[in-house]
């Protein structure tokens, strides 16, 4: 079992009431599910078992996950499967753009699995998706939530040159916990990715997110906020970690909604342009509103 936490940590039995959501069954949810299946597309909503899937899909919003559903890394918090991925689908960018058009999206979020097996880490597929969206939905803003493209020379530069409206890369947790939570990744490298993205495109918005409940303390969280601001990050998301299965990292603490609200206020005081800090906040949850766009 991947844990890295004290097994004696005590938590209330079951999730707190503020984390309970209804099972997705609405007509809007089912309609969007059909659209995505028709396009042969994946979403991080499904693959990462996001608790907000019912609400987002009911409202006609989804975060597209490109480059397949199999990741080359294994992070202790993530529910996306690990293995040997298939080659990129050359039809995926056009399928994604046409589906976004049918959904009448004004803000499109694209993320991906890690593709360390590809020479460019998948940057070329991100670029192709951005270009397809610009052709089909020229008025829509585009947000990319990317891997770190570690050891992929020139990949980040090429992607930022495609001018996504929002460049998002999550640090996920505090540096002390990286060895257990993100063993193949580097906190310092992720900060550099964000810093470099802002340097390459100062007019574009940069964004990052962190999960709480993995064993961090408040001082460490505030230090991450300060690091992100120093890297020029504009938007911040802060949400509660939820354990996908017993094989994943344990939840050490359920942070109360009031603490999320207080942290959000402290983040705004540090100079972030916009902050989403709540137990169910996620990188792509209400991403359009965070960027000042209404997808409704």
Curated annotation (Swiss-Prot):
NCBIfam families: lipA, PRK05481.1, PRK12928.1. Keywords: 4Fe-4S, Cytoplasm, Iron, Iron-sulfur, Metal-binding, S-adenosyl-L-methionine, Transferase. Binds 2 [4Fe-4S] clusters per subunit. One cluster is coordinated with 3 cysteines and an exchangeable S-adenosyl-L-methionine. SMART domains: Elp3. [4Fe-4S] cluster 1 binds at residues 45, 50, 56, 284. It holds the Pfam family Radical_SAM. Gene3D superfamilies: Aldolase class I (3.20.20.70). Belongs to the radical SAM superfamily. Lipoyl synthase family. The gene is lipA. This is Lipoyl synthase. The keyword Protein biosynthesis does not apply. It is found in: Cytoplasm. One of its GO terms (cellular component) is cytoplasm. Residues 57-273 form the Radical SAM core domain. Its cofactor is [4Fe-4S] cluster.
């Amino acid at each position: 079992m991947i844990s890295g936490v004290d097994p004696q940590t005590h938590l209330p039995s079951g999730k707190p009431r503020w984390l309970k959501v209804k099972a997705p069954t609405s007509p809007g949810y089912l309609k969007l599910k059909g659209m995505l299946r028709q396009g042969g597309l994946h979403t991080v909503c499904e693959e990462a078992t996001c608790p907000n899937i019912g609400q987002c899909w009911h409202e006609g919003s989804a975060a597209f996950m490109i480059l397949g559903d199999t990741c080359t890394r294994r992070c202790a918090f993530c529910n996306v499967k690990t293995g040997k991925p298939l080659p990129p689908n050359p039809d995926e960018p056009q399928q994604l753009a046409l589906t976004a058009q049918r959904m009448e999206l004004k803000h499109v979020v694209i993320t991906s699995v890690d593709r360390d097996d590809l020479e460019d880490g998948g940057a070329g597929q991100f670029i192709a998706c951005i270009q397809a969206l610009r052709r089909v939905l020229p008025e829509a803003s585009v947000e990319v939530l990317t891997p770190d493209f570690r050891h992929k020379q020139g990949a980040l530069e090429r992607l930022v040159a495609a001018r996504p409206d929002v460049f998002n890369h999550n640090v996920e947790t505090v540096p002390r916990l990286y060895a257990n939570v993100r063993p193949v990744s580097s906190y310092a490298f992720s900060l550099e990715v964000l810093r470099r993205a802002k340097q390459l495109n100062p007019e574009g918005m940069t964004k990052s997110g962190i999960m709480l409940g993995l064993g961090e303390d408040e001082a460490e969280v505030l230090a991450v906020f300060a690091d992100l601001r120093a890297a020029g990050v504009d938007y911040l998301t802060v949400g509660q970690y939820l354990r996908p299965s017993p094989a994943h990292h344990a939840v050490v603490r359920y942070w109360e909604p009031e603490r999320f609200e207080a942290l959000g206020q402290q983040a705004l005081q540090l100079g972030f342009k916009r902050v989403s800090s709540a137990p169910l906040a996620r990188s792509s949850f209400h991403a359009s509103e965070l960027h000042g766009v209404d997808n409704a």
